[in-house]
């Protein structure tokens, strides 16, 4: 046929059987990738430390999506929440991966069957004997079926009526587990961080989809609308389908990057805004203050802080710190977290408590500045010693640790104090193992960052595709120079231009 690479899809333009075939093959490829990727991730995943080395630190991409839908156990005998299990059941991580691969194989065979047996009676118009598709009817069927699936997911899977429920956690990502969720029918259901909204929105959207599907199955479009929107043209279907996909991609890019109940931080890592707003830092200070109010010592109050909460308050877990083109997991960047050293509290020789100013997200280097409770600069690590007046040595800064591995340890040696001041810029201080994975010390993004970048990029690409194919189908007559309602056969190329009234016509 000699088609250029960008026109190869025209081979299925008027061939419904093979159009189905290539779509089934596409589904086979997607399902096959998902299953294979899941098996690869399970082969390299280390479930031993869900607190300091969770799935998002290890760069897992498909495991979090399985987990948020209720899969927590492995045939390897481990659970994602820690500990061991004896009876994981068929729907383990490996079971889901295997199901995708089996489904992929069946789709592969179905695609071959439809490619070979492309000329089916069902595609033939009884009046003309030519292949044709009743696109408005097909739209109604698809809308109805997707509505049933949507309703079923919300009413049964999420609510636990027939299914496991979904991953639900507290606002600080400490108590996450799979549980049944009741639909939230009030205004709270519109809060993106309320899990009940997932159930209620799927039930509502599914109901709407079922009703809309039945409407499109029972009501034919008006002739003017049918012609105006080119409903008889398969490229109209392509254009509107691309619109649905790019819209969904933009939505999920937003819910992933800004955070929502559908993207728990225990599975995908914290968001950059939680670092920017000092979200975990405020909660840590609130808990310490509550401990002090109960007459606990500073050391006891800090020792009660969960290591998991302290780990979230570390800039290395900020997805915006990794460059888009730095390949590898977070563990390949700053290393595998081994333990929390504790919270450093700095004091000058007058006994004032000093706070290290934290590094903003988009800085690679940042001056070490220590301020008092009123925000007045009291100490720093100067760039030029000759002009320094707030240096650690001059001000006599000391550091003492509370909680963690160095609980109760204090340092007054200026070199050591400066070392911990630099590390305090990055949030809570952790011991990191960079030897095991030969980590290079350069921050990486989490799967939250990759997912957002990928979906935002493809959404922009698909937006262009929607405009392209929509314009092609709406203005087909303009681009081709042929009136779509032309009912006369014209001898092309025999005269100066198309539409010339002197052109010989043969009425059909």
From Swiss-Prot:
- Looking at the keywords, is Nucleotide-binding present? no
Q: Which Gene3D superfamilies match?
A: Photosystem II CP47 reaction center protein (3.10.680.10)
Kindly state what the record says about how the cofactor is bound.
Binds multiple chlorophylls. PSII binds additional chlorophylls, carotenoids and specific lipids.
Q: How does it sit in the membrane?
A: Multi-pass membrane protein
- InterPro entries in alphabetical order: PS_antenna-like, PS_II_antenna-like_sf, PSII_PsbB
What Pfam families does this protein's entry cite? PSII
A GO CC annotation given for this chain:
photosystem II
Q: Biological process GO terms, please?
A: photosynthetic electron transport in photosystem II
- What GO molecular function annotations does the UniProt record carry, in alphabetical order? chlorophyll binding; electron transporter, transferring electrons within the cyclic electron transport pathway of photosynthesis activity
Alphabetical UniProt keywords: Chlorophyll, Chloroplast, Chromophore, Membrane, Photosynthesis, Photosystem II, Plastid, Thylakoid, Transmembrane, Transmembrane helix
Q: Does the keyword NADP apply?
A: no
Task: Tell me the function of this protein.
Answer: One of the components of the core complex of photosystem II (PSII). It binds chlorophyll and helps catalyze the primary light-induced photochemical processes of PSII. PSII is a light-driven water:plastoquinone oxidoreductase, using light energy to abstract electrons from H(2)O, generating O(2) and a proton gradient subsequently used for ATP formation.
Stored PANTHER family? PHOTOSYSTEM II CP43 REACTION CENTER PROTEIN, PHOTOSYSTEM II CP47 REACTION CENTER PROTEIN
Quaternary structure and interacting proteins, as annotated: PSII is composed of 1 copy each of membrane proteins PsbA, PsbB, PsbC, PsbD, PsbE, PsbF, PsbH, PsbI, PsbJ, PsbK, PsbL, PsbM, PsbT, PsbX, PsbY, PsbZ, Psb30/Ycf12, at least 3 peripheral proteins of the oxygen-evolving complex and a large number of cofactors. It forms dimeric complexes.
Which HAMAP family does the annotation name? PSII_PsbB_CP47
- Family indicated by similarity: Belongs to the PsbB/PsbC family. PsbB subfamily.
State what protein this is by name.
Photosystem II CP47 reaction center protein
Q: Which organism is it from?
A: Morus indica (Mulberry)
